[in-house]
């Protein structure tokens, strides 16, 4: 996760294609903790150039805001629901998918921060790590579901063959 322990001070701001990585720690509604590793692609809107430096540390600001939103969102799901859909859930929160069906007031698609003209134009969800004992249960459940799905497909195929032979 990002911290302010070691900062690099510079007078240079790259305004396009900034890569910011973070690890977001969340807790689901059934009190299971998970860590999600993400990578954001961030741009700064040139129309907001006068606000680019209004936030002292844009990386910290970005990570803190998205972490807060993500912690609130994760509380809506059980660990099973979250684990199965974490990539979409995290990405939709990070880029503000519900509001990006149309362009934002800045003219860009993505989560926009008017405080400093920054916007997240993409979010890559890299991995999830769940408490080991819970991860084992989830993996076993997933394995059982795949086995049952294959058994069902096999049974349906046999029924179709039997029906075809009967006709």
Predicted regions and their residues:
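Elongated, amphipathic alpha-helices that form coiled-coils and helical stalk/scaffold elements used
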Residues: 4, 8-167
């Amino acid at each position: 996760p990002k911290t302010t322990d070691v900062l690099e001070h510079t007078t240079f701001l790259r305004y396009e294609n900034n890569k910011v990585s973070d690890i977001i720690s969340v807790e689901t509604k059934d009190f299971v903790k998970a860590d999600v590793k993400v990578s954001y692609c961030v741009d700064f809107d040139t129309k907001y150039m006068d606000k680019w430096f209004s936030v002292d540390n844009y990386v910290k600001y970005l990570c803190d805001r998205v972490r807060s939103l993500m912690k609130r969102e994760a509380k809506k799901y059980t660990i099973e629901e979250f684990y199965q859909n974490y990539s979409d859930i995290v990405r939709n929160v990070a880029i503000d998918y519900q509001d990006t069906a149309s362009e934002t007031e800045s003219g860009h698609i993505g989560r926009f921060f008017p405080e400093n003209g920054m916007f997240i134009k993409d979010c890559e969800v890299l991995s999830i790590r769940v408490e080991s004992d819970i991860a084992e249960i989830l993996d076993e459940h997933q394995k059982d579901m795949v086995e049952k799905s294959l058994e069902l497909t096999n049974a349906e195929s046999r029924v179709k063959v039997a029906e075809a032979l009967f006709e």
